[in-house]
Curated annotation (Swiss-Prot):
Joins adenosylcobinamide-GDP and alpha-ribazole to generate adenosylcobalamin (Ado-cobalamin). Also synthesizes adenosylcobalamin 5'-phosphate from adenosylcobinamide-GDP and alpha-ribazole 5'-phosphate. One of its GO terms (biological process) is cobalamin biosynthetic process. It catalyses: alpha-ribazole + adenosylcob(III)inamide-GDP = adenosylcob(III)alamin + GMP + H(+); alpha-ribazole 5'-phosphate + adenosylcob(III)inamide-GDP = adenosylcob(III)alamin 5'-phosphate + GMP + H(+). Pfam families: CobS. It comes from Corynebacterium glutamicum (strain ATCC 13032 / DSM 20300 / JCM 1318 / BCRC 11384 / CCUG 27702 / LMG 3730 / NBRC 12168 / NCIMB 10025 / NRRL B-2784 / 534). Keywords: Cell membrane, Cobalamin biosynthesis, Magnesium, Membrane, Transferase, Transmembrane, Transmembrane helix. It comes from the Bacteria. GO terms for molecular function: adenosylcobinamide-GDP ribazoletransferase activity; cobalamin 5'-phosphate synthase activity. It is a multi-pass membrane protein. This is Adenosylcobinamide-GDP ribazoletransferase. Its EC number is 2.7.8.26. The chain crosses the membrane at residues 22-42, 58-78, 80-100, 137-157, 161-181, 212-232, 248-268, 283-303. The keyword Kinase does not apply. One of its GO terms (cellular component) is plasma membrane.
Length: 307
């Protein structure tokens, strides 16, 4: 992730004229940088571009969520003819997420894990972070994070809260925004991290949390609990969680999960900053992937509690 983009030479007096509309430039460049979608991005890379991309990062998560819903509904008719195991669907969904972002965040998680697991001083840790080879720590952490997501999604696909799967990529990317808050610094003056770290304002995160919570409440109230992979509409039943009694509570659980993911990202970012003497793009990718894994597990807890 740290090598995805870097600063472009530019005339400071002409900088504003080389940028496009803030909203569209942020959204399109975020999709260009963070996915394999053939979307045109910005023509100039600087801190302004980086800030606009980070402000739009959760939108990329909503695009992932939209594609996830399409996959679920596309597999639905097939499951009506032949049995499609929930685990297989979960593997397909998680694999799709990774392919859509070119394994970028997973690569960042692996790099960060190798560097963090070395317990080396910041200069040496940064060298390990830049090493393209993956060690045991990186491989194990990446594997466990993916397995957590697959297991959690498998619990959700046949449940009455299947739609929560679509929010997992969103919450991961909101957690990624936390890593680039203004109180953080990049350890290198060049590269992707220098473009984006320290550009995010707290109110951006708060706004995305409100938008996500509102959409989650809408889904809990209006979307049928019938999973596209289930032939019978399973009613909400009494269980250990209030969500099993009041569907609207599910929206609150999504909001709580988002806050938990953000708190984790804040604490983890501080730890990484101390270990590396700053942050880079790999640190953002690691927080995105781990934030998504935490969100997936918390959603699965609700799904299992409602059985």
């Amino acid at each position: 992730m740290s090598g995805k983009a870097g600063f472009t030479p530019e005339d400071p007096e002409d900088s504003d004229n080389r940028h496009g509309n803030p909203l569209f430039e942020g959204i399109f460049t975020a999709l260009n940088w963070m996915t394999v979608l053939p979307v045109p991005g910005a023509s100039v890379f600087d801190r302004t571009t980086g800030a606009r991309v980070m402000a739009s990062l959760p939108f990329v998560g909503f695009v992932f969520g939209m594609f996830t819903a399409i996959i679920m509904w596309a597999i639905g008719p097939i499951s009506g003819v032949i049995h499609v195991d929930g685990l297989l669907v979960a593997v397909l969904i998680v694999a799709f997420w990774e392919l859509l972002n070119r394994f970028m965040h997973l690569d960042g998680l692996a790099d960060v894990s190798d560097a963090l697991g070395s317990y080396a001083a910041p200069p040496r840790a940064r060298e390990i972070l830049a090493d393209p080879r993956t060690g045991l720590f990186g491989l194990a952490t990446a594997m466990l994070s993916v397995l957590l997501q697959v297991a959690a999604v498998a619990s959700l696909v046949d449940s009455t809260v299947w739609w929560m799967i679509c929010f997992i990529p969103v919450l991961g990317r909101i957690a990624g925004q936390v890593t680039a808050l203004k109180n953080h610094n990049a350890f290198s003056p060049t590269g992707f991290g220098a473009l984006v770290i320290g550009t995010v304002k707290f109110w951006w995160i708060a706004l995305w949390l409100l938008v996500t919570a509102a959409l989650a409440f809408w889904c809990a109230e209006l979307i049928s609990p019938l999973s596209p992979l289930t032939s019978v509409n399973t009613p909400f039943v009494a269980g250990p969680f209030p969500a099993a009694i009041n569907p609207a509570w599910l929206g609150g659980w999504v909001a709580i999960t988002a806050v938990v993911a953000c708190v984790f990202a804040a604490l983890f970012s501080r730890r990484l900053s101390r270990s590396f003497g700053g942050l880079n793009g790999d640190c953002i990718g690691a927080c995105i992937h781990l934030g998504a894994s935490i969100s997936a597990v918390m959603f699965a807890v609700v799904a299992n509690a409602m059985v």
